[in-house]
Regions:
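Amphipathic, small/basic residue-rich leader segments at the start of a protein or domain
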Residues: 2-119, 130, 135-139, 143, ...
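Short, solvent-exposed loop/turn elements at beta->coil junctions and helix N-caps
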Residues: 87, 156-160, 187-189
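Short loop segments at secondary-structure junctions
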Residues: 105, 131-133, 175-177, 204-208
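Flexible, glycine-rich active-site loops centered on histidine and acidic residues
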Residues: 125-131, 153-154
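A short, Trp-centered hydrophobic/proline-enriched beta-strand micro-motif
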Residues: 147-156
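Active-site-adjacent elements of ketosynthase-type condensing enzymes
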Residues: 160-168
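A structural signal for short hydrophobic beta-strand segments in well-ordered beta-sheet cores
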Residues: 170-173
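A short core secondary-structure module
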Residues: 178, 182-213
Length: 213
């Protein structure tokens, strides 16, 4: 149930208002219906097609077909790229409104990918959109936004509490006009997917800089 905090002294009530906006309500209802009527039935097809498969890093015949059916249906309904706040490339939702959408996506293991809102692609697309060069956006962001490829994200390192990005020790050093990366990563999200075409790697370029840089 939506939560509305009581007024406290002179505090602004808006900062406690966690209700979905009225503008997002139609989209939320559409997503909810899609998950129940399209995503879940296709997920059942996906599971059935994968019975007997032993390799976790491959897809059995029929699995990707079920997934692509869902993606095609989502595209046709305009249920695509909700996570990007920029309305030109995404839906222009606030984080609060997207939280409600994400809660519905979580009711089916494939719903997020069917609507192109699955990690690690979501964060990788945000990085490319905000700091990517025009060439990088054309080569990598565009096919990611279109759901044609998948991506990976490499931050975790052996022996280091890597959930805090300040701790990463992998180095990137400029050698002429090329960056040379030295280090070790593991538990790389998305790397095992055969559709993965790009990996974003967290590295240090200036080890003597302040920790937050």
């Amino acid at each position: 149930m939506p939560y509305t905090a009581p007024s406290t002294g002179e505090m602004n009530d808006d900062m406690f208002d966690l209700r979905m906006s009225e503008e997002a309500r139609p989209l939320y209802d559409q997503v909810k219906a899609f998950v129940q009527n399209t995503a879940i039935p296709l997920y059942e097809e996906y599971v059935e097609a994968g019975k007997g498969k032993t390799d976790p890093w491959s897809y059995a015949p029929g699995q990707l077909e079920a997934l692509e059916k869902g993606k095609d249906a989502a595209r046709k309904q305009g249920l695509w790229n909700f996570f990007l706040p920029d309305a030109e490339t995404g839906e222009g939702l606030s984080n609060l409104d997207y939280a409600y959408i994400a809660a519905e996506l979580g009711k089916c293991p494939l719903a997020s990918e069917m609507m192109n809102c699955a990690a690690p692609d979501t964060g990788n697309m945000e990085v490319l959109e905000r700091v990517g060069t025009p060439e990088q956006k054309e080569q990598w962001l565009k096919p990611l936004l279109e759901g044609k490829i998948r991506s990976a994200f490499a931050m975790t390192e052996p022996g280091i509490p890597s959930s805090d990005a300040k701790n990463v020790s992998t180095r990137a050093e400029l050698d002429g006009d090329e960056w040379v990366i030295n280090g070790e990563k593991f538990y790389i999200s998305g790397a095992g997917d055969p559709r993965c075409k790009i990996m974003i790697v967290m590295v240090k370029t200036s080890p003597d800089a302040e920790p937050h840089k």
